[in-house]
Amino acid sequence: MSKYPLDLVQQYYPGAIMFEAQKYWSMSEDQKKKYNVAEVVDNGKYFGQLKKDGNWYAFVKGIGGQKYLFSRNESKKTGLLTERIENVPHIEKALDCLPNGTVLIGEIYVPGGDSNATRQVMGCLPAKAIERQKEDGYVHYYIFDCVAYDGKTFFDSGSWQR
């Protein structure tokens, strides 16, 4: 399921699970020529979701209640995904009500901003991230998927079922 060794993940992030960001599908040029795109879009087999101009993050509330916010970027030091929950204490507090063993996928974004504005907050140390948010406004977390809830994982379920 994951390219990240569980023992290494547990060493750095007790109670967490870690996985790569899902790859998103799009039609190749050959497929576009073969199929009527409007028919594919309207056939009921696919759905779209709003894309915010931010950055992908997975929120993990571990089995022991530990909270993590993993980006899709890997640390050069550990080879694991970078963790940024301390940059967004308001989001950590808002998600505290979720049961242990929950994993959400979403996008951290600056309302009215772009992905560079998001990186200005999420790419720095926590104290600077909090300072920037106090000055410029808080980032939001747009949740678009739930891949685990209360210890039950849904990785093998399709998007419609989740």
Identify the function of each model-found stretch.
Residues 1-69:
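RNA/tRNA-interacting regions in translation and RNA-turnover enzymes
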Residues 38-162:
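Covalent nucleotidyltransferase
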